């Protein structure tokens, strides 16, 4: 599709769609709790719909109403053997976390996904789950999907140090540990998003978190809750970037989740000299209104323990860096290589095609700014964040057209992205 170019200013107010991570987990905990859970503000993107369908296939009654989703939870012991293989679509969150849920079920399940998901290694999850007593068969030594697994009602507890900083792997092991006989200890490499831990407490469970060490006992039961999902800061990041780099812009973003494990993007913007204000802060919901204005940005260095707190925002941060004065260095971000695409290479290729000066490295990028961007043809390769990054980059293009191939990938996390873009574009 041809993208909008040469924007003369952005203005307006947007309500950000529900947080994808919280939407996934609220469906899972609602299904595993006893009673009726209602979820308000859920994201109805393709990834979340994959999770919803998987739990329907596992015997959970889920009603999608206009204002909320209603889940008739069955508990861990109420899941049923599905009549067919579970289709995870493009969702790494779905296949990894549901692997943990299924670890304590004594039936055999096959899980598969699209071409992109079928290239993503699952061994980070399958290796510790096998240690707990789960039988899993995948393709190659990296356990690429499809996965066939048979859980065990006699799961062994585990003490496990995560080899990488990954909230998905951590969460999969937490779901398995909840079904094990005894106490499990999970030790993180770096602190990652803590939505799973928060939701355990919200649904009446318990765990102990001491720094990077998580202790969790098996045999817990959950009680149904009402869940209000805040807006996704990973989706808001694209509008934050647009407001910063398109001249004469001022945007207000409502109901943005500001969980402390997800706000690395705000710290980077501050370090680059960007103007973002927080207001209407709701500490209970961990949400706020963000107001962003056009700013003169400067290069910075991004690495270390902040990386897990902004891993999904690095593509749009790379675009910000192309419009900052000076050099930006991103490091310790090798996790980008095993996302929906190799995001280090694909981000560099896409923005360089538009005139940026980005050098990919083994664990990140070196970006020289400031550069003028021009028209080009860019392929998302099925990666939603590459698509949205390119659409924001196109707003700066004054010469040539920007054509985006496989733009439908954006529906994974933000089905209303282009209508929201239209709403804030002037001139």
UniProtKB/Swiss-Prot annotation:
One Gene Ontology CC term in the entry: cytoplasm
Record-annotated active site: 312 (proton acceptor)
Pfam families for this protein: EPSP_synthase
Residues that bind phosphoenolpyruvate: 20, 92, 120, 168, 343, 385
Binding-site residues for 3-phosphoshikimate, renumbered to this chain: 20-21, 25, 166, 168, 312, 339
Biological process (GO), any one: chorismate biosynthetic process
Highest taxon in the source lineage: Bacteria
Gene Ontology MF: a single term: 3-phosphoshikimate 1-carboxyvinyltransferase activity
CDD domains: EPSP_synthase (cd01556)
Main location: cytoplasm
Reactions accelerated catalytically: 3-phosphoshikimate + phosphoenolpyruvate = 5-O-(1-carboxyvinyl)-3-phosphoshikimate + phosphate
EC number: 2.5.1.19
InterPro entries referenced in this protein's UniProt entry, alphabetically: Enolpyruvate_Tfrase_dom, Enolpyruvate_Tfrase_sf, EPSP_synthase, EPSP_synthase_CS, RNA3'P_cycl/enolpyr_Trfase_a/b
Similarity annotation: Belongs to the EPSP synthase family.
UniProt function note: Catalyzes the transfer of the enolpyruvyl moiety of phosphoenolpyruvate (PEP) to the 5-hydroxyl of shikimate-3-phosphate (S3P) to produce enolpyruvyl shikimate-3-phosphate and inorganic phosphate.
HAMAP family per UniProt: EPSP_synth (MF_00210)
Subunit structure: Monomer.
Record-linked NCBIfam families: aroA
Stated name of the protein: 3-phosphoshikimate 1-carboxyvinyltransferase
Species, as recorded: Streptococcus mutans serotype c (strain ATCC 700610 / UA159)
Gene this chain is encoded by: aroA
């Amino acid at each position: 599709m041809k993208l909008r170019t040469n924007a003369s200013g952005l203005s307006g107010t947007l309500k950000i769609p529900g947080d994808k991570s919280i939407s996934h987990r609220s469906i899972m905990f609602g299904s595993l709790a006893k009673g009726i859970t209602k979820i308000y503000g859920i994201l109805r993107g393709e990834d979340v719909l994959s999770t919803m369908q998987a739990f329907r296939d596992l015997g959970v009654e889920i009603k999608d109403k206009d204002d909320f989703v209603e889940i008739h939870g069955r508990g861990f012991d109420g899941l049923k053997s599905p009549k067919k293989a579970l289709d995870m679509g493009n969702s790494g969150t779905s296949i990894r976390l549901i692997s943990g849920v299924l670890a304590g079920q004594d039936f055999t399940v096959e899980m598969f996904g699209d071409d992109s998901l079928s290239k993503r290694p699952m061994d980070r999850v399958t290796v510790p789950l096998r240690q707990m007593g789960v039988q899993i068969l995948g393709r190659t030594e990296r356990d690429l999907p499809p996965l066939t697994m048979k859980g065990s009602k006699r799961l062994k507890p585990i003490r496990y140090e995560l080899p990488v900083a990954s909230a998905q792997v951590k969460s999969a092991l937490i779901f398995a540990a909840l079904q094990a006989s005894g106490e499990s200890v999970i030790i993180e490499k770096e602190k990652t998003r803590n939505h799973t831990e928060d939701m355990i407490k919200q649904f009446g469970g318990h765990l102990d978190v001491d720094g990077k060490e998580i202790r969790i006992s098996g045999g817990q039961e959950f009680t149904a809750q009402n869940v209000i999902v805040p807006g996704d800061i990973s989706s808001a990041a694209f509008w934050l970037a647009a407001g910063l780099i398109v001249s004469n812009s001022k945007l207000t973003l409502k109901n943005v989740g500001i969980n402390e494990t997800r706000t690395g993007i705000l710290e980077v913007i501050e370090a680059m000299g960007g103007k973002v204000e927080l207001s209407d802060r709701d500490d209970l919901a961990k949400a706020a209104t963000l107001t962003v204005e056009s700013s003169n940005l400067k290069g910075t260095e991004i690495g270390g323990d902040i990386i897990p707190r902004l891993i999904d925002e690095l593509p749009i941060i790379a675009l910000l860096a192309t419009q900052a004065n000076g050099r930006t260095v991103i490091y310790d971000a090798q996790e980008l290589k095993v996302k929906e695409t190799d995001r280090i290479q694909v981000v560099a290729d896409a923005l360089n095609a538009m005139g940026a000066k980005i050098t990919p490295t083994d664990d990140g990028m070196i970006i020289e700014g400031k550069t003028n961007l021009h028209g080009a043809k860019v392929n998302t390769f099925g990666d939603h964040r590459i698509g949205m990054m390119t659409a924001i980059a196109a707003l700066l293009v004054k010469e040539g057209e920007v054509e985006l191939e496989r733009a439908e990938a954006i529906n994974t996390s933000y089905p209303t992205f282009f209508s929201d873009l239209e709403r804030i574009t002037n001139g």
